[in-house]
């Protein structure tokens, strides 16, 4: 099942992504070998929906009862359990049972349940960040992470300095939300001519934030150029690709101009307005944004070309 594969990928990547600028609490020093052995033995088992329920009612049951067996007061448990297991549990809950439309109902509720102590609360913030926000997680999802961030910036468990990184992340996450008009910006071509994103005329626009010589950027470019569906849309001028370089090394940018097809728009942000005004999230490059004819966001900050194809085929 593709979702389960994504979850496994997310966990292998997210475990290493404990952000150094986020608040942590120290735990008691322990014997490392004993701790590792204990961590392997500990586990969390979510609630199980009654077998006789119809599928939709099972989903609703799991949304309501998934964490019933978890003791939110037991900080010893989260100090000792292998975090990979808890990241898996969180990923299954957030991506398997919570659609974007219900994120504002269930994600703040979970964070409130985790508010029994600062240690428990920051642990669940770490889980949410690893699954929903880490740039390497294929499960990252701002629509589900925003309610978590909004809870964090209001939490009495964090002081004003501890809330600052969450306030920053919230400001960025609120940009270019799905279904809303994408932030406009001016780009400059190699000829020196300038134009704006919103003046691109096409049924669809694919923003490709890229860096010169970036291996992952090359992979994404190859996926786009070898997609029969995308190439057909580009040839019919229904889809336009805007490759945008947000940084300052124009010599490197010019050296790599030939890396991209001539049919694509290849520009740079001369004033670094995208970064300075935080118009787009630049924490991970490459990044793709798919926009419709009115420049409403259909896909945000992703690298999944297959997902772009899926949206365009619907």
Language-model features, listed with the residues they occupy:
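Non-catalytic, surface beta->alpha helical segment in thiol-disulfide oxidoreductase systems
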Residues: 279, 283-314
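Structural microenvironment flanking redox-active thiols in thiol-disulfide oxidoreductases
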Residues: 221-258, 272-276
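Short active-site neighborhood of thiol/selenol oxidoreductases, capturing the structured segment around
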Residues: 195-226, 240-242
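C-terminal motif of bacterial Sec signal peptides marking the signal peptidase cleavage site
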Residues: 13-16
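Oxidative protein folding and maturation machinery
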Residues: 19-193
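Short acidic-hydrophobic, aromatic-tinged amphipathic segments that line or gate anion-handling sites
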Residues: 188, 265-270, 301-302
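Sec-dependent signal peptide recognition
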Residues: 2-8
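Short, internal strand/loop/helix patches
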Residues: 257-289, 293
